[in-house]
Structure formats: C-alpha cells, structure tokens
Swiss-Prot record:
GO terms for biological process: amino acid catabolic process; carbohydrate catabolic process. Reaction proceeds via a syn dehydration. CDD domains: MR_like_2. Mg(2+) binds at residues 222, 248, 276. The lineage of its organism: Bacteria, Pseudomonadati, Pseudomonadota, Gammaproteobacteria, Aeromonadales. It comes from Tolumonas auensis (strain DSM 9187 / NBRC 110442 / TA 4). Substrate binds at residues 29, 55, 345. One of its GO terms (molecular function) is magnesium ion binding. Binds 1 Mg(2+) ion per subunit. The record marks 345 as: Transition state stabilizer. This is L-rhamnonate dehydratase. The gene is rhmD. It holds the Pfam family MR_MLE_C. InterPro entries: Enolase-like_C_sf, Enolase-like_N, Enolase_C-like, L-Rhamnon_dehydrat, Mandel_Rmase/mucon_lact_enz_CS, Mandelate_racemase_C, Mandelate_racemase_N_dom, RHMD-like. Signal peptide: none annotated.
Length: 401
C-alpha cells in the first residue's frame, strides 16, 4: 500500500480571552456562570482573596481551544483539539509546519521527535508548547487511521478488554452513582491558607457523600496543585475513616520529593495520584520513581498519544496504573489497549452534573459518552478517532504559512 504524504497543516482556534465566556470545547474550563467547575475550587491562587472564589478570575479559561487539521495529498483530513488557542496556532503555522508537510502520513514518531527537539529551547517542561505538540500528534494519528481505514486503538495493537468503565469527576458523586459510574471524584474547596478548618470542611464533604453513596462506591479528592505535604497528609487522614480511594494532585507538578513523602506518609490503603500537569516523558519517569500509585497524564497536554503510550510503559514496568486525565476519545482509544488501565475518567461538564454532556462539547460531532458508566469498544470502531469537527463553531485561522 502506497501511503499519501501530508500536503498541509492548518491551525485554528475558538474561545479564549477574546471570546464570549462559555465557549467550552477542548478548553473545558471555559464554561458559563453557575457551573460547578468554577465554583470555589481550591487552586494555587486561592491564597489570594480576590482569586479564591473562581478559577476564571485568575484566567484559567484564557487560552481557548486549538484545532489542528492535517490534510494528505489524497484529500483526506485528520484533526484534533486541545487547549492552546491562538498562541498554539502561531507555533504550528510559523514553526512546526516544516516538520509536518511533505512527510508520509505514517511518519508520526519522526514528526513527534522533530517537534520535541526543535522546541526544546523554549518549551521547558511542558505547558502551552507541549499542548500544541500534543494536538498535532493526535491529528496525525487521526489522519493515519482515516487513510488506512482503522480506528486508532487498532493501530496501537487492539483492545485488551471489551469495554472501558469510568468514574466521574464532578461535584455530585451521588448523581454519578445513579448514572452507573464506578466512582466519583470531587474537587477540594479549601487549602493550607484555611488551616485545619479547611480540612474539616472538605472531610465533612467526603463524609456526606459516603453517607449518600454507600460503603462501596469509590470516592476520591482532586486537590489541583493547591496543597503542601503537611496539609495533604492531614487531609488524607481526616478522610480515611470515610474510605477515600485516592487523593489526587495535591502538590505542584515538580515537587517530586513532596510526592515521595506524601506517598510514604499516606494512610494505609489510600492511593496517591498525579500527572495531569506533567508535560515531558522525563517528568513522568521522575514522577513514577516517587512511588505514587497512579499516573494521570492528559493526552492533549503531555505530548500526545505517542508520549502517552511511552508513559503507560513506564508505569507498567513499575507496577503502577496509568489512568489518563479525562480527554474523551483521545484517551479512550489508548486506554482500551493498556493492560494497566482498568478504568478511566469521565469529566462531567453539565453545570450541575445532572446530565451527561460530551466533554469537549460543542467542538466535536459524534463524541461518545458512557452508557451506564461504560463505553463498549464497538463505539470506537470508526476510522481515526471517530469524531468530526463542528464547523458551526466560530473557528479562526489567525496565521498562515
């Protein structure tokens, strides 16, 4: 089979700081008013009074959605979305395009390595540049799947299970249980600046939902980089009587010694997890060495599917789980091929968590949602990632090359 070459890469964006609030899409923090995802959630900025009530107040939604299209010389188009907005468009159109155009559609690893090497001097350890590279990588996998007529998970070697089971992240674990999810992960609302009073409040929330959900439903806490080791350890012990399954991302990404200490001091049986804001393979290697139980890369932020597969191998070698941060179809196609991913995350994006809404709504068409907390592999049996770009969204292409 003679494979086509990549004719053109195009970068679009929607939402972000210049758009009306609530665009949604891959920048799923960009929601409207009265949404749980922006309601007094503990963050590294919570210690400042003017930024403690809302994550949007300090600009969590300023980037917007990046859309990458890669077109082959036979006319087929692959695409993907992530969080990088207009700045990601500049990086692709003015820098990364030279490593993409003219290559065979199967040259994904070569392109990936060249993008990483060429941006090393300004990419640092992740962030915006890595989000952009991730989006390109995902678009390339989508194109390759469409060209050969296979879903991405089959390009990775095929499914190791018939379905993916999910836990739900949101403010209402009780509703998640009713919908058939295996667990519910809640955001913490208080941090070290609130002292022991904050610990008591978040522990009381866990106690409340343990009472509502019964003894066997999983409950977890997402701390979003807002704590220090001492506070996180005390919170973990305060929640231990309520059978908290894990405590997540308590510390900033690079505090590896802190994660090692937290894992060493955590209550017996309670897992320590992190990884969604790590952005290089090397950082995941170091994170794995801390001994945490679950690594949680975001496939749209960590370097794409190419890096996610490598992270899963690091975790597997150490006997750790890899459970990606919720990233919809882009993680679905990966985790159904990983033997060390027995479950996955679904992020609730409806304002009060009362209905199932596609995570990247409205940017993707045919984006699947779990049914009774599960997605069967047959749902993924479409070429590429199996979704379409919603061109009714206000897409802008600010740069060309």
């Amino acid at each position: 089979m003679v494979l086509p070459k990549i004719k053109e890469v195009r970068a679009w964006f929607t939402g972000g700081a210049t758009a009306e609030k609530g665009a949604g899409g891959a920048d799923y923090h960009d929601q409207g008013n009265h949404h749980w995802i922006d309601d007094h959630i503990a963050t590294p900025m919570s210690k400042y009074k003017q930024y403690e009530q809302s994550r949007q107040s300090f600009g969590i939604n300023v980037l917007g959605t990046l859309v990458i299209e890669v077109e082959a010389d036979n006319g087929q188009i692959g695409f993907a979305v992530s969080t990088a907005g207009e700045m990601g468009c500049f990086i692709v159109e003015k820098h990364l395009n030279r490593f993409i155009e003219g290559k065979c559609v199967s040259d994904i690893k070569l392109i990936h390595d060249q993008m990483l090497g060429a941006t090393m001097y300004y990419a640092g350890s992740g962030g915006l540049v890595m989000n952009t590279i991730s989006c390109v990588d995902l678009a390339l996998w989508d194109l390759f799947g469409k060209v050969v007529g296979l879903p991405v998970y089959k390009l990775l070697g095929g499914a190791v299970r018939d379905e993916i089971q999910f836990y739900a992240t949101g403010a209402r674990p009780d509703l998640a249980k009713e919908m058939g999810f295996i667990g519910g992960k809640m955001p913490t609302h208080w941090g070290p600046h609130d002292g022991d009073k904050g610990i008591r409040k978040d522990a009381a929330m866990v106690a409340e939902y343990r009472e509502k959900c019964g003894p066997d439903f999983w409950l977890m806490l997402d701390c979003w980089m807002s704590q220090d080791v001492n506070y996180a350890t005390k919170l973990a012990y305060a929640c231990a009587p309520y059978n908290l399954k894990w405590i997540e991302e308590c510390l900033p990404p690079q505090q590896y010694e802190g994660y090692r200490e937290l894992k060493r001091n955590a209550p017996p049986g309670m897992m320590v997890t992190s990884g969604e804001h790590h952005g290089t393979l090397q950082s995941f290697q170091t994170l794995s060495e801390t001994g945490i139980d679950i690594m949680q890369p975001d496939v749209g932020w960590c370097g794409g599917l190419t890096t996610l597969v490598e992270v899963a191998a690091i975790a597997k070698a150490r006997g750790q789980l890899v459970v990606p941060h919720g990233s919809s179809v882009y993680s679905h196609h990966a985790v159904i091929t990983f033997t060390n991913t027995p479950f996955s995350e679904f992020l609730m994006t409806s304002p009060d968590c009362s209905v199932l809404r596609p995570q990247f709504d409205p940017i993707l068409i045919n984006e699947p949602v779990p049914v009774n907390g599960r997605i069967h592999k047959s749902v993924l049996d479409k070429p590429g990632f199996g979704v379409e770009l919603n061109r009714d969204c206000k897409l802008k292409r600010p740069y060309t090359h």
